[in-house]
């Protein structure tokens, strides 16, 4: 049993949505600090199995120290590589449920060295996997003003994106932009403070999404899930902003909607294009959870099952 640390968002709803079979095989695509993983394991029998992914080596190390369970397999990898990994394990079409929590974990936000937070000072990194790729500092240095503005707008809908990008480049003429509070202060001079929202929220979100290619990875794993899941297997995704949720919503709608066929055509059953999924709806965060955990206020859980 793990020490209580990370507060898993929409825990009860996600456990219900997975419709867990005691002897089933499940995937937690984003282990984090293991709150959801522990919940799944608690509902499995000795024959059940959980495969947990995380690209953050700190999460894997935490799991190895705090969650020793022979039903659990830990994979240090981005979930976008799920299909190839599950294929190698001989489990294609045998997974009874996939849970994807797209949020940044509390330890990641609270660890200044990770560079995710605009509230504590630290190196401007923002990589989920710090062993690979370009940090936020490196990208902001190499990108031009237009590229920065486009990323900030595309991944957060920040209306002041061009003004922010201009201020970033002006700052870099005389300074090395390398800490979180430096960036937060630049943005705060451009964006007005809103109730319950820091001025730099959208900018940090956009740069983090870009650095980690989060939307590209999400689109990839959603498509992969159609092959990975067993018949009636559940797909449950918790998103935290409208851009993510729109991708999930459209994917489920596209794959659960039967195409309209012209009347009178001589088509036999096996020629009709089948739908992959059944849309099981969405869940919103309860007021009680929001009161207890402000970070949960924007969470949406969407659920589908494989036909």
Curated annotation (Swiss-Prot):
Primary localization class, coarse: cytoplasm
What are the annotated GO cellular component locations?
Answer: cytoplasm
What Pfam families does its record include? Methyltransf_5
According to the UniProt entry, where is the signal peptide? Answer: none
Report the record's Gene Ontology biological process terms. Answer: rRNA base methylation
Q: Which residues bind S-adenosyl-L-methionine?
A: 34-36, 54, 79, 101, 108
Q: Which locations, inside or outside the cell, does it occupy?
A: Cytoplasm
* Matches recorded under InterPro entries: RsmH, SAM-dep_MeTrfase_MraW_recog, SAM-dependent_MTases_sf
Enzyme Commission identifier(s): 2.1.1.199
Provide the alphabetized UniProt keywords.
Answer: Cytoplasm, Methyltransferase, rRNA processing, S-adenosyl-L-methionine, Transferase
Q: Which domain of life is it from?
A: Bacteria
Which reaction is this enzyme known to catalyze? cytidine(1402) in 16S rRNA + S-adenosyl-L-methionine = N(4)-methylcytidine(1402) in 16S rRNA + S-adenosyl-L-homocysteine + H(+)
One Gene Ontology molecular-function label? rRNA (cytosine-N4-)-methyltransferase activity
Which EC class is this protein assigned?
transferase
**Family from the record:** Belongs to the methyltransferase superfamily. RsmH family.
Q: What does this protein do?
A: Specifically methylates the N4 position of cytidine in position 1402 (C1402) of 16S rRNA.
Q: What is this protein called?
A: Ribosomal RNA small subunit methyltransferase H
Organism this protein belongs to: Vesicomyosocius okutanii subsp. Calyptogena okutanii (strain HA)
The lineage is: Bacteria, Pseudomonadati, Pseudomonadota, Gammaproteobacteria, Candidatus Pseudothioglobaceae
């Amino acid at each position: 049993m793990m020490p209580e640390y990370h507060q898993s968002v929409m825990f009860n709803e996600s456990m219900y949505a997975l419709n867990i079979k005691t002897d089933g095989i499940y995937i937690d695509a984003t282990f984090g600090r293991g709150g959801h993983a522990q919940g799944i394991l608690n509902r499995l029998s000795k024959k059940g199995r959980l495969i947990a992914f995380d690209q953050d080596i700190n999460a894997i190390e935490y799991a190895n120290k705090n969650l020793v369970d022979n039903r659990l397999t830990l994979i240090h990898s981005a979930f976008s590589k799920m299909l190839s990994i599950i294929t190698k394990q001989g489990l294609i079409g045998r997974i009874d449920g996939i849970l994807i929590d797209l949020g940044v974990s509390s330890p990641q936000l609270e660890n200044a060295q990770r560079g995710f937070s605009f509230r504590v000072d630290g190196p401007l990194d923002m990589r989920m996997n710090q062993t690979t790729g370009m940090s936020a500092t490196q990208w902001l240095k190499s990108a031009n003003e237009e590229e920065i503005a486009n990323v900030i707008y595309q991944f957060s809908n920040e209306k002041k994106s061009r003004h922010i990008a201009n201020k970033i480049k002006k700052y870099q003429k005389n300074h090395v932009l390398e800490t979180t509070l430096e960036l937060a202060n630049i943005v705060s001079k451009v964006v007005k403070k809103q109730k319950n929202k820091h001025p730099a929220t959208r900018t940090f979100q956009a740069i983090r999404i870009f650095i980690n290619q989060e939307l590209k990875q999400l689109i990839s794993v959603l498509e992969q899930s159609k092959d990975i899941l067993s018949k009636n297997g559940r797909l449950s995704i918790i998103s935290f902003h409208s851009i993510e949720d729109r991708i999930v919503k459209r994917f489920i709608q596209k794959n659960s909607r039967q195409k309209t066929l012209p009347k009178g055509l001589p088509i036999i059953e096996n020629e009709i294009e089948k739908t992959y999924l059944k849309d099981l709806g969405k869940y919103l965060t309860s007021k009680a959870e929001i009161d207890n955990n402000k970070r949960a206020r924007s969470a949406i859980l969407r659920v589908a099952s494989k036909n």
